[in-house]
Amino acid sequence: MTDAAGGRQEIWVEKYRPERLEDVVGHPDITERLQSYVDRDDLPHLLFAGPAGTGKTASSVSIAKELYGDDWQDNFLELNASDERGIDVVRDRIKDFARSSFGGHNYRVIFLDEADALTDDAQSALRRTMEQFSNNTRFILSCNYSSKIIDPIQSRCAVFRFAQLGDDAVAAHLREIAETEGLEHTDDGIDALVYAADGDMRRAINALQAASATGDSVNEETVYAITATARPEEIETMVTEALGGDFAAARATLDDLLTNRGLAGGDIIDQVHRSVWEFDVEEAAAVRLLDRLGEADYRIAEGANERVQLEALLASVALNAE
């Protein structure tokens, strides 16, 4: 848990990053296909699409480690398109890396994370660069939404879609880490971590490490406190109150979450959205709720006041209560 040389605590996301494709959690079908490329040393350009924390970066780094061994860092360039947007990164950094010496390997790998953040011009330049250096460079592009990648790039890549990780896979991995670290934990603590992470393994591991820093057992109360996440029953209570026509009670619950608990409006919307079909409500009520939820989410994204939009959401639901 602690770096002996520097006395600093290691980041568990890095400490437990998979070393091999077979260690990547939750996507055996994908890793098996990727392993066949590595075993043949015949890697095509790859496009990894899916939500954050599902194994896209872990798979890319594992590929490099298996292909290049101890030399993997010299033959693997990782760039984040959201940090380095525009045409310059495509023309300069990628080209400089692709043109440099190879150290005995047939090709090198460039990993471009959040490639869907690149402008259309940058993607067009990237497509030309992929063609220019295809004999000695392989590209792995990672994105949340493949629809934001231009067709000429998609047609040059083998596309792999990483689905959100299942709760069981996340829970099992968290228990392995907790046992390795000698960390006391409860079942409800692991369940809370899984709920807060919502399929994002990176978020789950970071939350586990943050919870461990309290020095106490990792339990439900600790997890919800350090992740600023509402308990599922709190979300259900707020929505049920509004659906029952009790706007004042629903607003009081919302106020507690926003003011006393410090939750962001967008996080509350996300939690309501993922839980709506688990509520004991009629389908028509759930549909109305989703319709208003979409409006509130859009307006908040456009810069509207979070509290006003969430209160308007609850008011609309309460007014339509049967």
Swiss-Prot record:
Gene it is expressed from: rfcS
Name of the featured protein: Replication factor C small subunit
A Gene Ontology molecular function term of the record: DNA clamp loader activity
Function comment: Part of the RFC clamp loader complex which loads the PCNA sliding clamp onto DNA.
Residues annotated to bind ATP: 50-57
Entry similarity comment: Belongs to the activator 1 small subunits family. RfcS subfamily.
Assembly: Heteromultimer composed of small subunits (RfcS) and large subunits (RfcL).
Highest taxon in the source lineage: Archaea
GO CC term (a single one): DNA replication factor C complex
UniProtKB keywords: ATP-binding, DNA replication, Nucleotide-binding
GO annotation (BP), single: DNA-templated DNA replication
This protein's record includes keyword Transmembrane helix: no
Any one Pfam family match given in the protein's UniProt record, by short name: Rep_fac_C
